[in-house]
Amino acid sequence: MAQVQYRGTGRRKDSVARVRLVPGTGKIVMNDKSVEDYIPFADIRKELLQPFEVTETTDQYDVLVNVNGGGFHGQAGATRHGIARALLEVDPDFRTPLKRAGLLTRDARMKERKKPGLKKARKASQFSKR
């Protein structure tokens, strides 16, 4: 018999995470590596677990993540968004606490583009009056 899986897709900055939740012990695997190997910073790893803490489902699901694009923070944010969406499939009653914690909202902030004539998005060379 096929194992029960819950899927969710999360996005943040340039990162896209495809998340699968499988009933288990709380293992997190990102791109075939353990989360400790994939994301070296504990504070960013803690961010991933927020949806489980809000819904009180910590250590009830194994998380399998395929993520690409962006850096550590973007990928962690995308994974968090994907986990929150997958938890909605588990139980639609989770919508209220997840929404209240702001975990279902896609963070729309993106990198501002570089403008011609400037060194970066907003950095200009020093202004000389005379």
Curated annotation (Swiss-Prot):
<keyword id="KW-0687">Ribonucleoprotein</keyword>
<dbReference type="Pfam" id="PF00380">
    <property type="entry name" value="Ribosomal_S9"/>
</dbReference>
<protein>
    <recommendedName>
        <fullName>Small ribosomal subunit protein uS9</fullName>
    </recommendedName>
</protein>
<dbReference type="GO" id="GO:0022627">
    <property type="term" value="C:cytosolic small ribosomal subunit"/>
</dbReference>
<dbReference type="InterPro" id="IPR000754">
    <property type="entry name" value="Ribosomal_uS9"/>
</dbReference>
<dbReference type="InterPro" id="IPR014721">
    <property type="entry name" value="Ribsml_uS5_D2-typ_fold_subgr"/>
</dbReference>
<keyword id="KW-0689">Ribosomal protein</keyword>
<dbReference type="InterPro" id="IPR020574">
    <property type="entry name" value="Ribosomal_uS9_CS"/>
</dbReference>
<dbReference type="GO" id="GO:0003723">
    <property type="term" value="F:RNA binding"/>
</dbReference>
<feature type="compositionally biased region" description="Basic residues">
    <location>
        <begin position="111"/>
        <end position="130"/>
    </location>
</feature>
<dbReference type="GO" id="GO:0006412">
    <property type="term" value="P:translation"/>
</dbReference>
<comment type="similarity">
    <text>Belongs to the universal ribosomal protein uS9 family.</text>
</comment>
<dbReference type="InterPro" id="IPR023035">
    <property type="entry name" value="Ribosomal_uS9_bac/plastid"/>
</dbReference>
<dbReference type="InterPro" id="IPR020568">
    <property type="entry name" value="Ribosomal_Su5_D2-typ_SF"/>
</dbReference>
<feature type="region of interest" description="Disordered">
    <location>
        <begin position="105"/>
        <end position="130"/>
    </location>
</feature>
<dbReference type="GO" id="GO:0003735">
    <property type="term" value="F:structural constituent of ribosome"/>
</dbReference>
